[in-house]
Amino acid sequence: MESLGRGLASCALLLAVAVSIGAQPYDNDYTPTVDHPTFAKTTGPVVLIDEAHNNYHTCEGRYKVLCELLENDGFIVESSKSPLSAKSLKKADVLVIANALNAQNVTDDENWKTPILPAFTKDEIDAVEKWVAGGGSLLLISDHMPFPGAIADIASRFGVVWQNAFAFAADFNFAKAKGNPNMINFGLSADASGGIGHAHPIFQGRNAASVAQSVTSFTGSAFRLKPNSGVQPLLELGEGTMLLYPMASQEQTMQTPNASAVGLLQGAVLEQGEGRVAFMGEAAMFAARIAAFISPGFKMGMNNPDAPYNKQFTLNLFHWLSNNL
């Protein structure tokens, strides 16, 4: 751990950073159009959205736009409120787990406190691992603390060690945190925010029209890989990025433990058995929301003009997961 420094005043200032979640509805004015759908309407692969584990992102809520985007591309999108098992996964081609949480960690004020308990049972993790080996594809998404702690066990099964922390861009100004959106841009060239993208078909797309030159995240978390995991880095955190490790999500001060995030990841992919897995350390990049806690009307996700390729990156990601890329 290291000192916060980097422009903080000497007083014990509670950081007014852009990490407060609060009420963030989806953007009613944003329509996730797809000019050239990959599949005819309702004929594509089945995408199952996990909603059985107190998920912060669901098709009816914060992932409404994501689900609409996938449907507009021809995917069949279904929500599941059943425990993960061979039966519940049988018809799914892609399983999306986004910001799951153990019931004991759910709070009305969203000031989540440690310890963070697992969101999944061993039987559920076993079922998912077997399903992936047999050809299923998993998209595991975890925002900042507390969500990494809740999915640590299932991530570990696939060789990923998730940090129960908040990730910060290299150009984030802690002394002027209020109103700072903390956006990290991952392209194939160096970026002032500290994001480093790794070449992969998810960036390249199927043709020139589907290239995603970059993808932008909004805070989130980070993870490292176990030795010989076989996991391929996709979104890497570079020089100047850092992590904060609060004991309570909305209680961050100059004394909050912190560390460099250099070399850690916000995105990675894995081919295991007949299946595929993608790990993403930020959820809003796949959404389209309004984050008034940053500034009135602030657009967070694929609706943000400074994240022009997030929609295409999202489509490419699901094409890769469904073996259509």
Please place each PLM-identified region on the residue numbering.
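Bacterial N-terminal signal peptides that target proteins for export
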Residues: 1-11
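Bacterial N-terminal signal peptides
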Residues: 10-18
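Short, surface-exposed patches at the edges or C-terminal ends of soluble domains, predominantly
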Residues: 21-325
